[in-house]
């Protein structure tokens, strides 16, 4: 028997000794073959190879025309035992050509310097490597930090185990305060098309579910991204942004295309196909020609960035690895480097540390998910100072094969037409379904299908045909194909985790297995099978898909089969599922199933009152018995279905109180859909409860006189769920009982009582409350409220906890939508500010409150100010992912201890007016503060951010202006507190930033000042006017000024310590107001714009100047050099250098040297007064006397 190879045998071990194995497979016209696997030498030692004709000739000692599988290692031309790739050839019948199956044998070699990762591996440790940040891809798909992986030190930890063939690619680098890179992470709502970024950058790279979106798939204006098509619920959004503009090249491939001509200058290219990152082993670039190793499909979209995107700071290196054995781990360690930031890719997919894809710990990368055999890991390391005694060269980055060897292997395999990517082997599936050669393609939405084209849907392994445009899932006009009668495709989807043994409901003689579209190799130990059981070397997790192609050889070798069955005349699954299926199944009485059913049970009997007693179930009981059991369980145990009458005009307080009094711990209480009128219902102390209020509206009756009352009061609730609580306070129909105040009364919609813990509230609504929406007691912990809507609330929405309250911890408010609170007119009379959440205590500090996701519109004009948080004695408070309307007075009103406050990812819904972070800072506030930080706050309007000194750091914020005020006497700050603005932008109004109190160091780093200043004000003005603490400094580092006024910085106090370093733009001058002096002035590498006097001050006590340039004079204000001449007959020459030097000139900085010979004078000297320098001689010269003069700043 002869097999002709489609390529050259010179690329493989031509002797085939011990390397070729036969795995029998049965095809329709094949002869019978015994089961088993044989090497060629075992079957026929006379096998030969003819290199000239590329033919393997062997007899096998069996009948001709036998279908089978040949597999052997390719070798690396230097050592045949270290073959990196195993080729498997399917030998079929005359109607189908032979073809290759390509399998990585990663135990032999790897294309990167990293050690080979294990199947199930999540932890990777690399010696001598540290990093702080990483960008990670798995199979070219960007991973989400904090969810997909975590990083710590040198370790990446993935959340979930990776699969065989997954490729990990990591880029690492440092965490720098000076970075221009910004990340935005969010989760999509269903049909969402708009993404609003809390910043503005020149370049924004949008990944959805880790896949890069192409430039023509969305538009971006300012900070708003608009998608051409909508996202689905919970789609992961990840935007990487910076100010680097990188040109790109795009193309759409035609079938089997490999080469593309790139227009533009190629510097450090980054290549994507269909949004998936391609590693440099997948392509080569020669000149402007991009060549892919593998042929592309028609419609594949190619995107090439011509230079590095610099999406992470201080890139050091990259790490790449392929998962190839069976150890159970999920960490990655990056070898040989010290670094502070990295990017991790798994199978080309960028991993995201903030979404939990991995953790870093020293040099150890811990993946959140174990990897599988064949997974490829790639890491780029940034900011990695190499140790002198541990220099890493490029050669060190290859562990087994040299770069030359790997390139030789890649080129040779490419010539053989071998695809080195893990993917379903389409020729194998074509054989199983009897399809023409090269007629099968991978299903991709948007492709056009014509006649005689077939498509493999990779989600479930089914094959489809038809004419039309492919959708997201197969449907009409496409139809699913059945495989050959001799070859059955069976699909299994894991319904739970850790499945490693699977029962196949068929008797089969051979099997090929694909897991999530990846071919598994029994020779590499991926699986074994015994009878109808498959035993996997790893474990499937929920949702994993297994497709088995089963060879039904046993049907043809069973001597007891009838002639009809052997020739395919048997009942198929589709036959049984038809309307006549019951006629094809026989029974023991000689009838078919339909006849037996007709004889045993007639339709009249089944339709009678006791018909349910006749029909049985799998438990052995009748349907009626099963129904009776379910009803009994409801009645006897844990469910109470309320008998409240919905939409009745009667007050049903008494009935509901009676029902809740009968509840015991562990029960479920279900109320009907509709409106229920109640006044006050007290739910007793309970545990393990489920309250299903979905669809019920609890409303206060008209004409009620509530005074101090609660509509729903949970006395004390633990380990319970409350779903759909909707309360309506009916504030427009209550009765005034005070006689003076039409809004008197402290009725609240619902109350959570003392000692409640571990309660989950889902979809909570509060409207029309007279007082607060909800008030809580004390010692409450671990409460989650997810999905909150509120409107027309009299005062606070959540009051936690009022008089007698406190010691409440771990409270999370998620996904809040607030239309209006604080609407009571009495709030104005009492100057009473109201909040979405008010923290208060009298018995102990509250701790760990968090608001995550808030839209606060305030559609009504409030009685007084409304704010997000009134914080009285909550130690930790976190407010993130919020947007507020123009009627909101502020974000925070500090009234007590708050050691840690973080406000992040927030912006104003109105672009014409702003919202201050700090609403008020009263002297009565007993604030104990340790660390406050604001990040990604976008308020680019005219509103001033007052009391800014309460925060320690502002990072990536956009404000109109800022003011600092005096510290109140009761405030206790941490030692060494400073005020920093990092990467901030200020669009100033008609008056500048006012730093009237300089009580600690204030620094502006990488900030931009866009001024609209006119008149006699500065961009940053009145520095230290009211108070300036000695030895404090105001500094501007790497800042850009766009000032059009007559001066840029105005100081006011004689003790000012001012520093400007690496500043640029339109800087007019520094002006000491009110005829004051400057104590200390440092200016370095700074350019002033068009002014003859960069600094105006009565005096400068100490100055340090270097590289201070004035564009109007072109002079360096740290150095002056010239030639002065005393005319014949005169004894002095002098000049005022005030237009050249800033402040007074020291006599020690002046150097004077006579030039050439002269007659008359015997000595000379200099006199310095302020900025005037004069040279004197004792005797007038007879001719002009020239001096070289040099003055340093």
UniProtKB/Swiss-Prot annotation:
<dbReference type="GO" id="GO:0098671">
    <property type="term" value="P:adhesion receptor-mediated virion attachment to host cell"/>
</dbReference>
<keyword id="KW-1160">Virus entry into host cell</keyword>
<dbReference type="GO" id="GO:0098996">
    <property type="term" value="P:symbiont entry into host cell via disruption of host cell glycocalyx"/>
</dbReference>
<keyword id="KW-1238">Degradation of host capsule during virus entry</keyword>
<keyword id="KW-0945">Host-virus interaction</keyword>
<keyword id="KW-1227">Viral tail protein</keyword>
<dbReference type="GO" id="GO:0098015">
    <property type="term" value="C:virus tail"/>
</dbReference>
<comment type="function">
    <text>Functions as a receptor binding protein (RBP) and probably mediates the attachment to the host capsular exopolysaccharides. Displays a depolymerase activity that specifically degrades the KN5-type polysaccharides of Klebsiella pneumoniae capsule.</text>
</comment>
<dbReference type="InterPro" id="IPR011050">
    <property type="entry name" value="Pectin_lyase_fold/virulence"/>
</dbReference>
<protein>
    <recommendedName>
        <fullName>Depolymerase, capsule KN5-specific</fullName>
    </recommendedName>
</protein>
<keyword id="KW-1235">Degradation of host cell envelope components during virus entry</keyword>
<dbReference type="InterPro" id="IPR012334">
    <property type="entry name" value="Pectin_lyas_fold"/>
</dbReference>
<keyword id="KW-0946">Virion</keyword>
<keyword id="KW-1233">Viral attachment to host adhesion receptor</keyword>
<keyword id="KW-1161">Viral attachment to host cell</keyword>
<dbReference type="GO" id="GO:0098994">
    <property type="term" value="P:symbiont entry into host cell via disruption of host cell envelope"/>
</dbReference>
């Amino acid at each position: 028997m002869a097999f002709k190879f489609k390529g050259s045998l010179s690329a493989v071990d031509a002797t085939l000794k011990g390397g070729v194995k036969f795995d029998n497979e049965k095809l329709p016209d094949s002869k019978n073959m015994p089961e088993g696997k044989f090497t060629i030498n075992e079957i026929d030692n006379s096998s030969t190879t003819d290199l000239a004709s590329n033919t393997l000739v062997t007899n096998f000692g069996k009948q001709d025309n036998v279908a089978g599988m040949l597999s052997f290692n390719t070798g690396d031309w230097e050592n045949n035992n270290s073959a990196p790739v195993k080729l498997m050839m399917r030998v079929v019948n005359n109607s189908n050509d032979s073809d290759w199956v390509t399998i990585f044998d990663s135990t032999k070699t790897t294309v990167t310097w990293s050690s080979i990762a294990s199947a199930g591996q999540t932890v990777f440790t690399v010696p001598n490597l540290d990093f702080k940040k990483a960008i990670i891809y798995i199979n070219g798909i960007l991973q989400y930090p904090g969810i997909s992986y975590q990083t710590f030190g040198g370790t990446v930890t993935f959340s979930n185990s990776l699969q065989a063939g997954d490729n990990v690619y990591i880029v690492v680098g440092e965490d720098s305060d000076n970075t221009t890179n910004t990340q935005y992470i969010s989760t999509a709502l269903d049909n969402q098309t708009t993404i609003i970024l809390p910043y503005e950058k020149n370049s924004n790279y949008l990944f959805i579910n880790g896949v890069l979106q192409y430039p023509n798939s969305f538009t971006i204006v300012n900070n708003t991204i608009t998608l051409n098509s909508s996202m689905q619920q919970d789609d992961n959004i990840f935007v990487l942004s910076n100010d680097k503009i990188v040109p790109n090249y795009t193309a759409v491939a035609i079938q089997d295309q490999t080469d593309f001509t790139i227009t533009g200058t190629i510097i450090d290219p980054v290549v994507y196909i269909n949004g998936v990152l391609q590693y440099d082993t997948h392509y080569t670039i020669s000149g402007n020609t991009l060549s892919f190793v593998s042929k592309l499909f028609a419609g594949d979209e190619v995107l090439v960035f011509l230079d590095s995107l610099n999406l992470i700071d201080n890139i050091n290196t990259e790490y790449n690895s392929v998962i190839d054995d069976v150890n159970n781990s999920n960490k990655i360690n990056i070898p040989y480097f010290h670094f502070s930031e990295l990017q991790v890719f798994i199978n080309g997919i960028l991993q995201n540390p903030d979404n939990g894809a991995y953790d870093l710990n020293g040099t150890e990368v811990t993946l959140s998910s174990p990897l599988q055999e064949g997974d490829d890991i790639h890491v780029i390391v940034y900011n990695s100072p190499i140790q002198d005694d541990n220099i890493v060269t490029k050669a060190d980055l290859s562990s087994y094969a040299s770069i030359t060897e790997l390139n030789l292997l890649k080129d040779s395999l490419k010539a053989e037409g071998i695809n080195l990517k893990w993917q379903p082997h389409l020729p194998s599936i074509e054989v199983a379904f009897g399809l023409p050669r090269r007629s099968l393609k991978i299903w991709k939405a948007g492709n056009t299908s014509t006649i005689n084209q077939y498509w493999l849907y990779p989600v479930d392994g089914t094959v489809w045909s038809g004419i039309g445009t492919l959708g997201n899932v197969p449907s009409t006009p496409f139809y699913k194909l059945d495989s050959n009668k001799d070859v059955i495709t069976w699909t299994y989807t894991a319904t739970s985790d850790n499945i490693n043994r699977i029962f196949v409901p068929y008797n089969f003689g051979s099997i090929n297995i694909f897991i999530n579209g990846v071919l598994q190799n029994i020779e590499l130990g991926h699986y074994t099978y015994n009878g109808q059981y498959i035993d996997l070397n790893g474990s499937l997790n929920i949702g994993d898909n297994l497709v088995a192609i089963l060879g039904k050889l046993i049907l043809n070798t069973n001597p007891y089969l009838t002639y009809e069955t052997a020739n395919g005349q048997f009942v198929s699954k589709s036959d049984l599922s038809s309307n006549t299926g019951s006629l094809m199944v026989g029974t023991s009485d000689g009838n078919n199933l339909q006849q037996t059913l007709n004889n045993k049970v007639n339709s009249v009997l089944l339709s009678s009152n006791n018909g349910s007693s006749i029909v049985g179930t799998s438990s052995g009981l009748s349907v009626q018995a099963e129904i009776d059991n379910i009803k009994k369980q409801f009645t006897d145990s844990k469910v109470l279905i309320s008998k409240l009458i919905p939409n009745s005009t009667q007050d049903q307080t008494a009935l509901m109180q009676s029902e809740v009094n009968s509840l015991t711990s562990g029960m479920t209480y279900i109320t009907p859909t509709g409106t229920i009128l109640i006044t006050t219902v007290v739910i007793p102390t309970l545990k393990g409860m489920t309250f299903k209020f979905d669809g019920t509206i609890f409303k206060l009756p008209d004409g009620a006189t509530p005074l101090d009352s609660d509509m729903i009061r949970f006395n004390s609730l633990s380990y319970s769920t409350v779903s759909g609580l909707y309360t309506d306070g009916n504030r427009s129909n209550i009765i005034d009982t005070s006689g003076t105040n039409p809004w008197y009364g402290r009725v609240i919609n619902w109350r959570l009582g003392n000692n409640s813990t571990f309660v989950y509230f889902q979809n909570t609504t509060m409207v029309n409350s007279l007082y607060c929406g909800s008030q809580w007691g004390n010692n409450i912990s671990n409460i989650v409220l997810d999905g909150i809507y509120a409107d027309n609330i009299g005062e606070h929405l959540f009051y936690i906890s009022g008089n007698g309250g406190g010691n409440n911890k771990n409270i999370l408010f998620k996904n809040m939508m607030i239309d209006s609170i604080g609407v009571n007119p009495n709030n104005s009379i009492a100057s009473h500010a109201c909040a979405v959440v008010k923290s208060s205590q009298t018995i102990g500090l509250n701790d760990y409150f968090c608001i995550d996701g808030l839209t606060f519109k305030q559609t009504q004009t409030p009685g007084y100010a409304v704010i997000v948080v009134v914080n009285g004695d909550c130690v930790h408070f976190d407010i993130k992912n919020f947007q507020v309307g123009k009627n909101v007075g502020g974000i925070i009103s500090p009234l007590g201890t708050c050691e840690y406050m973080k406000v992040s990812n927030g912006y104003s819904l109105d672009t014409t007016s702003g919202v201050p972070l700090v609403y008020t800072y009263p002297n009565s506030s007993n604030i104990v503060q340790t660390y406050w930080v604001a990040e990604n706050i976008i308020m680019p309007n005219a509103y001033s951010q007052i009391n800014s000194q309460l925060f320690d750091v502002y990072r990536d914020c956009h404000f109109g202006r800022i003011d600092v005020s005096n510290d109140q006497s009761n405030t206790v700050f941490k030692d060494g507190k400073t005020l920093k603005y990092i990467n901030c932008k200020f669009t100033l109004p008609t008056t500048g930033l006012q730093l009237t109190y300089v009580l600690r160091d204030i620094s502006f780093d990488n900030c931009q000042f866009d001024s609209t200043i006119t008149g006699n004000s500065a961009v940053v003005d009145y520095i230290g006017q009211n108070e300036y603490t000695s030895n404090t400094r105001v500094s501007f580092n790497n800042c850009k000024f766009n000032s059009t006024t007559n001066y840029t910085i105005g100081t006011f106090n004689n003790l000012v310590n001012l520093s400007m370093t690496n500043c640029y733009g339109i800087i007019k001058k520094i002006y000491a107001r009110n005829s004051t002096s400057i104590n200390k002035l440092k200016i370095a590498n700074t350019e002033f714009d068009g002014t003859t006097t960069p600094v105006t001050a009565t005096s400068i006590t100490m100055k340090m100047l270097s590289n201070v340039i004035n564009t109007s004079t072109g002079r360096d204000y740290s150095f002056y050099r010239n030639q002065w001449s005393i005319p014949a007959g005169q004894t002095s020459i002098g000049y005022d250098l005030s237009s050249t030097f800033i402040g007074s000139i020291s006599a020690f900085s002046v150097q004077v040297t006579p030039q050439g010979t002269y007659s008359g004078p015997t000595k000379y000297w200099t006199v310095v007064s302020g900025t005037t320098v004069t040279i004197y001689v004792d005797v007038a010269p007879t001719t002009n006397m020239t001096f070289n003069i040099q003055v340093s700043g």
